[in-house]
Every structure is written in C-alpha cells, then in structure tokens.
C-alpha cells in the first residue's frame, strides 16, 4: 500500500466516522418534529447560515470544474462568483422568503411556488422536476468523490468502493440528524474545505517554485497561452465584457434558486442573518474561489504548462504528483467537504419534497386527514434510503451525459421556476 493511500484512508475514514456519529447523535432530537428535521427549528445562527449556504454551493464540481475551466478559459472565470449580486439576493429575496416561511410554515421551494401561483398541479409539476434534477446531481457528487479518491490513492481505492463509502456517510448523516446535523456539519465542512484548499495552494507553491508567487510567474511568463489567461478575455477570447457580465449574473441567480439553497432562507434565526449574508456570503465565496482560480490560471500552468491534457482532474493530479502524501490526503478532505455538503443538502431538500409535497400533502392534508409528525419524519427517512439507492444505480451505470444533464440543465430550470415578482 502506497503512502498516498495510507494517509487518504486514515483521514477520510476519521472524517466519515465523525460525520456518522454526529448525525446519529441527533436521531432522537429530530424524530419527533418535522419542523426540527426539515428546518432545524428555524433557529440557525448567522455564522452557521453563512457557512452552510456557502459550502453547499461549492460542490465536487467546484473542486474539479473551477480550476479546470479557469485553466482552459482564463481568470475571467472568477466572475462566476456572482460578486455582490449573491449577497444582494439574500438581503432582498431571501429575507422575504424567511418572512413567508415563518408566517405560513413553508419548508420547501414547492410550498412557496404552489402558494404563489395558487395551483396544486403546478406544485406537483415543480416537485417532480426538481427531484428529477436533484437525483443525478447528488449522484455526480458521489462520482467526483469516487474519481478523486481513486486518483489520490494512485488506484489503490477502487472507484465504486469510494462511492459506497461516501454514500453511506451521507445517508446515515441525513437519516439521523436532518437539517440540524446538516447545518452544523456544513459549518465544519466550510472551515475544513477552505483551510485544506489554502494548505494545498501554499504547499504547491513552496514545494515547486523558488521565490514564491514571483517564481510561479517566472515559470509561465514565456508561455503566451498562460499569460493571456491571467486576464480577460483569455487565450480563447471567451471572457469579453458581455461574457463576464453574463457569467456573473447567471451564477448569482442560480445560487438562490437551487432547492437546497432556497431552503436555507427558511432556517434563519432572525433578520440579522440576512444583513450579514449580504456581505458574508460574497466573502466566503472569495475565500474559496480565489484559491481554486489560482490553481487553474497560475499554479497549474506554472507546473504543467498550458498543454496539460487531463485538466478535468487538475487538482487531484497536482496534489498527488507534486505534493507530499499527507497534502494529497488533505486535498481529498477538501473534495469530501465540498461534495458531501452539497450532496446531503440536496438530498434533504429532495426527500422533503417527495415526502411532504407529493406524499403527505396529497395522501393526507388535502383530504382533511391528520399527519402525525413522527410518522412524517419516519417516512422521510425511508425516502432518504430509496433516493440513495437510486443515486447508486446512476453512479454504477455512469451515463456519459450525466454532467450535461445535472449541471447545464438543472440551473436554468431552477431559475425559470422563480416567480417574476
């Protein structure tokens, strides 16, 4: 067994055990009330809400996609942070959703959409399509973990074994703790993910270049493609001014309309949460995406040049081949933090829609029948297991179109169901 495998297995194993214990420790606390299981009693404090929202956006695709895309397209890709637009959305839209959630007991995006358009059928339509988008997207988080661990251990850990491990810890964590456990773990994952990312950045620079960041520039200054990618429009000409504005607005709008982010607006403790979100969330994005972009436009080209043909695995490749084994394992923890936070948040959102909006509402509430809170939580936990099985099937089949389906189609659809007013 190589040292990369040893360090990765130890760190990821400890992380997984800790996560399962933390989730199951909340089992009894969340079993008696849907308000606790779905909404954490609408009592999440400001720091936790900022961390939970930010890390739920970062996903395994950010870990792979941002360095890869910026490596190919240039520094203009950082416009995808959405800048101040992201904070503005939560101050303007998120705050109003919070008020409506408190007033009418909203839990899911469907609660609001159904009420806004006065249509049960529209609610069913949106719920089905949102769940249809969520399942492959969560599966994609598992795929990134499987690929990342396989690369980080230099093939020692099989892809599907890593996927099963990630699936198990997500399932047990959501099953046991609901939103209470998810929000707490997201805070831990934000600190872990950002911290490990910057450890990787510093180690790659110190270990591979004399003179720090100046040494990195010396390595790329004679490569016209790499130099062009340090600014806009980049070597490909992709990031013109309209292109940058389009990227910024699209990314920022997509943030709040994703179901798992939408639901974050309901769990805030007070108005102050949204005042801080207005500046705290863009700051959280900046801390993370700056590190990912630096790897893509600066460190990656400095080490590998501009013609690297495995850009889609840029971060794990650099961590495994140009950093000590312990740092490679640390980078794997960063991927775990991003992918698992997004995966479990979307899983919880999807199971809430299946259970509450599709089953309980139409089987009980619309017929005037009572629905016991304990039973609803129990049914939700069953749906968690069923949905995870569905995701494993997708991961096993691994259809080639899953990235296009989950990533390119879901964001525009989620954005289109947001009401115009």
Predicted regions and their residues:
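Membrane-interface "cap" regions at the ends of multi-pass membrane proteins
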Residues: 1-64, 174-177, 190, 196, ...
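Hydrophobic alpha-helical segments and their helix-loop junctions in multi-pass secondary transporters
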Residues: 18-30, 94, 134-142, 146-152, ...
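Hydrophobic, small-residue-rich membrane helices and short re-entrant helix-turn-helix hairpins
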Residues: 105-118, 177-188, 257-289, 311-314, ...
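Membrane-interface helix-loop-helix modules in multi-pass membrane proteins
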Residues: 38-105, 243-254, 261-307, 318-342
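Selective recognition of specific alpha-helical transmembrane segments in multi-pass small-molecule
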Residues: 13, 18, 125-140, 173, ...
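Helix-loop-helix module between adjacent transmembrane segments
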Residues: 19, 80-175, 246-251, 337-345, ...
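Loop-to-transmembrane helix boundary motifs in multi-pass membrane proteins
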Residues: 116-124, 131, 160-164, 355-399
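Transmembrane helix-loop junctions in multi-pass membrane proteins
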Residues: 24-27, 60-69, 135-152, 174-180, ...
């Amino acid at each position: 067994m190589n040292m990369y495998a040893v360090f990765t297995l130890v760190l990821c194993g400890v992380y997984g055990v800790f996560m399962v214990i933390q989730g199951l420790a909340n089992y009894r606390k969340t079993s008696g009330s849907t308000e606790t299981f779905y909404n954490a009693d609408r009592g999440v404090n400001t720091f936790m809400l900022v961390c939970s929202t930010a890390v739920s956006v970062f996903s395994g695709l950010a870990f792979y996609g941002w360095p890869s895309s910026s490596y190919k397209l240039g520094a203009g890709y950082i416009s995808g942070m959405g800048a101040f637009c992201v904070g503005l959305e939560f101050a303007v839209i998120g705050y109003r959703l919070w008020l409506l959630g408190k007033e009418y007991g909203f839990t899911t995006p469907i609660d609001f959409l159904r009420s806004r358009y006065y249509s049960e059928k529209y609610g069913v339509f949106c719920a089905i399509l949102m769940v249809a988008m969520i399942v492959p997207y969560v599966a994609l988080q598992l795929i990134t973990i499987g690929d990342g661990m396989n690369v980080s251990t230099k093939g020692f850990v099989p892809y599907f074994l890593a996927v099963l491990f990630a699936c198990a810890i997500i399932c047990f964590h959501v099953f046991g703790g609901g939103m209470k456990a998810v929000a707490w773990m997201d805070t831990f994952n934000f600190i872990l993910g950002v911290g490990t990312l910057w450890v990787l950045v510093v180690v790659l620079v110190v270990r591979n270049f004399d003179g720090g960041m100046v040494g990195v520039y010396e390595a790329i200054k004679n490569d016209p493609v790499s130099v062009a990618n340090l600014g806009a429009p980049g070597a490909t000409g992709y990031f013109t001014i309209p292109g940058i504005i389009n990227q910024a607005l699209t990314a920022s709008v997509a943030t709040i309309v994703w179901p798992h982010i939408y639901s974050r607006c309901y769990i805030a403790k007070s108005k102050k949460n949204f005042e801080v979100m207005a500046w705290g969330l863009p700051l959280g994005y900046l801390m993370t995406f700056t590190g990912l972009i630096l790897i893509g436009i600066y460190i990656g080209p400095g080490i590998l040049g501009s013609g690297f043909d495995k850009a889609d695995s840029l971060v794990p490749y650099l961590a495994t081949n140009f950093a000590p084994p312990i740092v490679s394992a640390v980078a794997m923890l960063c991927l775990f933090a991003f992918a698992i936070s997004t995966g479990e948040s979307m899983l919880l959102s999807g199971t809430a829609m299946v259970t509450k909006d599709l089953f309980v509402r139409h089987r009980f509430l619309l017929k005037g029948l009572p629905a016991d809170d304990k039973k609803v939580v129990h049914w939700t936990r069953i749906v968690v297991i069923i949905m995870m099985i569905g995701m494993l099937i997708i991961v096993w089949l691994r259809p080639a179109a899953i990235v296009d389906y989950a990533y390119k189609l879901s964001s525009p659809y989620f954005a289109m169901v947001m009401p115009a007013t």
